[in-house]
């Protein structure tokens, strides 16, 4: 097993800064492009990350630590952000994400006072029994997944424009 709480927190702390540096100030063309029908653009990915910060990671962690595996924690609607109207700029969304993430990391540090708690078990509504360690590992991998998704979606915008170089661009082969 590779999980290390300190290292996990490093990634979770850096994600908001990474996204802010990469996305702030970009034109709407970059922020609104997607990979086709039923896929998310960059703004929607950020909205999803905000939704997950509010309703997924810390609420589930608290539920596991309070309830254990006797009762399944509430499901998380991964598509909830698509049903909300947003007029916020990308900078406003990134600021909101950063603020909630920093609060969540403070809460994480308060909740996980010792390594033994990483083995606490809860009941996922689909997967059954899960450990805190797995939830936190998923949080990190989720960040990395969506950073990769944003980069891939943005590269897709220029697929036709790169001409024959497409052959050398691995990101366009996914």
Describe each PLM feature range.
Residues 8-11, 23-25, 68-71, 85-87, ...:
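Short acidic/polar alpha-helix capping motifs at helix-coil junctions
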Residues 1-3, 173-174:
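Basic/polar N-terminal segments that are highly enriched at the extreme N-terminus
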Residues 12-16, 54, 101, 108, ...:
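Hydrophobic faces of stable alpha-helices that mediate helix-helix packing
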Residues 2-12, 39, 43, 90-94, ...:
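Amphipathic, non-membrane alpha-helical segments in soluble helical-bundle scaffolds
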Residues 21-24, 28, 62, 66, ...:
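Charged/polar positions within long, soluble alpha-helices
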Residues 32-76, 122-174:
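Short, contiguous alpha-helical
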Residues 78-119, 134-142, 149:
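Acidic/histidine-rich alpha-helical segments that form the ligand environment
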Residues 2-30, 51-63:
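Alpha-helical bundle segments that constitute or directly flank the non-heme di-iron/ferroxidase center
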């Amino acid at each position: 097993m590779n999980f290390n709480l300190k290292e996990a927190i490093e990634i979770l702390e850096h994600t908001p800064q990474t996204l802010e540096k990469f996305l702030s100030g970009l034109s709407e063309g970059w922020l609104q492009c997607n990979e086709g029908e039923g896929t998310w653009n960059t703004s929607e990915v950020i909205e999803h990350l905000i939704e997950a910060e509010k309703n997924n990671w810390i609420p589930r962690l608290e539920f596991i630590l309070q309830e254990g595996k006797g009762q399944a924690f509430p499901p998380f609607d991964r598509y909830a952000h698509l049903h909300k109207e947003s007029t916020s700029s990308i900078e406003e969304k990134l600021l909101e994400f950063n603020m909630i993430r920093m609060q969540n990391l403070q809460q994480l540090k308060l909740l996980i006072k010792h390594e033994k708690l990483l083995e606490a078990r809860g009941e996922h509504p689909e997967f059954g029994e899960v450990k805190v360690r797995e939830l936190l590992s998923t949080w990190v991998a989720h960040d990395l997944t969506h950073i990769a998704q944003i980069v891939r979606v943005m590269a897709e915008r220029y697929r036709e424009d790169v001409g024959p170089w497409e052959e050398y661009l691995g990101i366009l082969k996914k």
